[in-house]
């Protein structure tokens, strides 16, 4: 109370629940996503289906800001330059990001790039790509939407994924 006044601290993992119950994607703001290139390609493909848009409660993501799936931290200076250019040219008012360890090197810099809300949804990016394990906290009732194009899923870095509650859109 002494530090926060009348504001109670909110547990950081609340963003997982807000992602899992689609609350974040139903916000009336322009939403962009920042994540691994391979996963964002899948999300883009899924967003072409009205059924998936309805599931999320979102017509579209305004921006897909991609980072390399692997070795994203190897050249932090380059990564920040690339991110800054894309973020400054984006329409988004809110960015949902799942960037793994890279977050440690970029989150403090992002507020200087553009006045927006940046929410680290972590494995929520995997959920949006239809790749979340239903045993992960908060995602027990999440339905993984997928397309049958197997090539789209080649070389995707999976985080403890076990196929469950999968629904194919095509």
PLM feature spans:
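Short, flexible loop segments at the rims of nucleotide/cofactor-binding pockets, characterized by
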Residues: 7-12, 70-77, 97
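Electropositive, gly/pro-rich neighborhoods at or near active sites that engage anionic ligands
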Residues: 1-58
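C-terminal functional extensions of proteins
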Residues: 105-170
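Structural motif
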Residues: 30, 93-94
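Residues at the starts of beta-strands that form the adenosine-phosphate
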Residues: 30, 61, 117
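Conserved nucleotide-cofactor-binding alpha/beta core module
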Residues: 34-90
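Gly/Ser/Thr-rich loops at beta-strand to alpha-helix junctions
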Residues: 36-40, 96-105, 125-126
């Amino acid at each position: 109370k002494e530090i926060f006044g009348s504001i109670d601290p909110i547990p950081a993992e609340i963003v997982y629940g807000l992602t899992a119950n689609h609350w974040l994607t139903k916000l009336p703001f322009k939403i962009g996503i920042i994540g691994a290139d391979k996963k964002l390609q899948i999300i883009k493909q899924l967003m072409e289906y009205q059924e998936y848009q309805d599931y999320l409660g979102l017509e579209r993501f305004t921006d897909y800001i991609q980072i390399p799936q692997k070795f994203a931290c190897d050249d932090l200076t380059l990564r920040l330059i690339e991110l800054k250019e894309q973020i400054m040219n984006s329409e988004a008012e809110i960015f949902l990001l799942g960037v793994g360890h890279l977050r440690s090197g970029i989150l403090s810099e992002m507020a200087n790039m553009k006045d927006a809300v940046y929410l680290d949804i972590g494995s929520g990016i995997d959920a949006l790509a239809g790749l979340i394990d239903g045993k992960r906290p908060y995602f027990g009732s999440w339905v993984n939407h997928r397309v049958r194009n197997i090539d789209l899923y080649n070389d995707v870095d999976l985080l403890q994924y076990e196929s469950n509650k999968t629904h194919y859109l095509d």
